[in-house]
Structure formats: C-alpha cells, structure tokens
Amino acid sequence: MKTTLKLTAIAAMSAFILTGCATQDKSAEADAQLQQQAVLGLNWIQQSGEYQALSYQAYNAAKVAFDHAKVKKGKKKAVVVDLDETMLDNSPYAGWQVQNNKPFDGKDWTRWVDARQSGVVPGAVEFNNYVNTHGGKMFYVSNRKDSNEKAGTIDDMKRLGFNGVEDSAFYLKKDKSPKAARFEEIEKQGYEIVVYVGDNLDDFGDEIYGKQNAERRDFVAQNKAKFGKTFIVLPNPNYGGFEGGLAKDYFKGDSSSKVKARLGAIKAWDGK
C-alpha cells in the first residue's frame, strides 16, 4: 500500500513538473514568436532609404510649420517633441530583444538608457538646433523615467549633437504616462506650443490615450487638417499606442494573447 501511494505521488509530481515545463515551453515559444514578428519592421528602420526619407520629410514639414507659426502677444514660441523613435533611435535595443527573444522589460530598458548608445532619427538634430537658434524653445516630453533615466538621456543627446538639452527642457515621466498635464506646465511658463512632434498619436494629447484603434483612427480623421502643420508624425512600425489598440487589455496579456490579438486583427483576402 505504501509503495502504491509513493508511486502515485511520484507520478503526480512528475505530471505536475511536465505540465510546468510544457507551460514554460509554450510561453518561451510565444515570446520568440512575438519578437520574430518585429524583424521586418526592424530591418526597415535600420536598412531602408524609405525610413530615412520619411523622417527627413517629417522634420522638413516641422521646420516649415515652426517658421510659419504665429504666437499670441506676450507668448514665447515652443515646440514639444517626444524622444524615443522621434529624436532618438533605439532600434539596437529592439535588435537585442529580437536576438534574445526578450519581451519589453523596464529594467532592461533602463540598462539600455544607461548604456548611452542611442542613435539619432534622421533630421532630428538639425530641426532641434534650428528651433533653439531661431526664436523657439524645444521641450522634450517623454515617458522615459524622470527618476533614473534623465542623466543617460541628456548625455546621449549631447553626444549626438543636440543643443539646448539642459535639465529644465525635459518633462519626463514621474507618475503618469499621459502627457497633457506636462504640456500645460510648459504653457504656464509663458510658452505657446506651436508644433508637436512624435511617433505616437498619444504624443499629441490625452484624448485617445489607451483607446482602441477605431477611436484612434477617428481622432486622425477629425484632426486631419493639423497633420503636417501642428502635428508631425514620425514612422515607427514596431511599437506604440496602436499595439495596445489591437484588443482590450492587450498589454495585460501574456505573449500568447498578444500574438493571438495581432493575428486576429489582420484583414485578409479569402483567396477566391
């Protein structure tokens, strides 16, 4: 009887271990699948002339918009920009994720920022320095963390040739991701924001923060006259608010659920 009980216990434990291993294997497989889906977009950012052309095009439009913008009497001219994939190129970090099948992790991201190896988005330095030397002021409103990612960010930007990157120009994330409150802080200092530059619709306000893609597309349609004038968009196929807009609670799910949501959102020909 004791032998039977021992064998039963061993069998149960073995089944538990095997189930756990299978779950871990499926999780690792989903992590890998999620990262491999980013490969072509990453190739496009790092290798294509089209990505560079679109970036220059965006900053050329931003310069024209800045030059033509008028501010109210007594106000100072300001431009608000996002940082990641707007001014700074983090595609090597994305490459590390792909090669190691690593989903986004805040600690890994901070290590990347600390490494001070960001690249520059084409046209960003020239636009930044033009604004700061032609009667405007650049403000960097980013969800990099204010507490432990500001120093590495400033060092990187100085290394890359950005001027005007003193501490007071940075409005990084302290507690909340939405940016409208930080825009208001800038305006309270006597500035009028005439141009917003970003790779994510959330860089232009909070109206559609966390919303689904249908609502995000509606926002674009309602504000189409502002794009290329007040709102300047940089290309970024790899991540952003659009990803969370694929499904409700998308970012609360694991890699498997994200893969499912991505595939489920595709519109496809039936072959007939």
Task: Briefly describe each language-model feature range.
Residues 70, 90, 241-244:
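Short, solvent-exposed loop/turn elements at domain surfaces
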Residues 4-7, 14, 19-81, 248-249, ...:
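Non-catalytic pre-domain segments flanking phosphatase-related domains
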Residues 78-81, 88-89, 137-142, 169-171, ...:
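Structural recognition of the beta-strand scaffold that forms the well-ordered cores
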Residues 67, 71, 92-93, 129-137, ...:
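Sec-exported extracytoplasmic/periplasmic mature domains
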Residues 44-55, 110-118, 139-145, 171-173:
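Second-shell loop/turn segments in exported
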Residues 25-32, 150-272:
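C-terminal cap/substrate-recognition subdomain and adjoining C-terminal extension
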